[in-house]
């Protein structure tokens, strides 16, 4: 998987030597794998790896356990960690957005405060789901493009991997 991610990142020109890449780490398999893979590639790519965790506070103590896990993981790996959080339910009520949309907007607003590039752990499976959802919404050919590998400061190095590949590596 490491070689696939490296080749993908180079083909997509995701980073340049000297870049800081902040991995968005939820605590789930995809983002934890991404953190490990990018750490293993930092010398090869000449990049600096940091991490970020956004606590949505939607699952009570479970959300706090996710944050504690990410804190412990980053400490054990020696990776600087940026943390943030927000009241997703309050935003959704105020803006009449769905919880998912409110969470996404708060999370991406947090990402905007981070240094360098921000890596999210979207996979081939996520991309397929996005394409199918776009088709059902009637987006036409534009919807067939799916999740872009790089958009602005956001990079998606794991788009080359399936969820099954990621789970097999953990």
Show the residue positions of the predicted features.
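Core alpha/beta nucleotide-donor-binding catalytic domains of modification enzymes
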Residues: 1-25, 29-169
């Amino acid at each position: 998987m490491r070689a696939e991610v490296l080749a993908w990142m180079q083909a997509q020109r995701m980073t340049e030597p000297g870049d800081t890449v902040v991995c968005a780490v939820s605590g789930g398999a995809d983002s934890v794998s991404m953190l490990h893979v990018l750490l293993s590639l930092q010398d090869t790519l000449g990049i600096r790896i940091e991490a970020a965790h956004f606590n949505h506070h939607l699952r009570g103590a479970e959300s706090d356990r996710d944050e504690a896990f990410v804190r412990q993981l980053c400490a054990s790996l020696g990776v600087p960690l940026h943390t943030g959080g927000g009241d997703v339910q309050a935003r959704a009520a105020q803006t009449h957005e769905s919880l998912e949309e409110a969470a996404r907007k708060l999370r991406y607003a947090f990402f905007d405060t981070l240094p360098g590039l921000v890596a999210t752990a979207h996979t081939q499976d996520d991309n397929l789901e996005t394409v199918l959802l776009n088709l059902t919404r009637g987006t036409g050919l534009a919807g067939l493009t799916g999740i872009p590998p790089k958009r602005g400061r956001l990079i998606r190095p794991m788009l080359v991997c399936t969820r099954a590949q990621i789970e097999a590596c953990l």
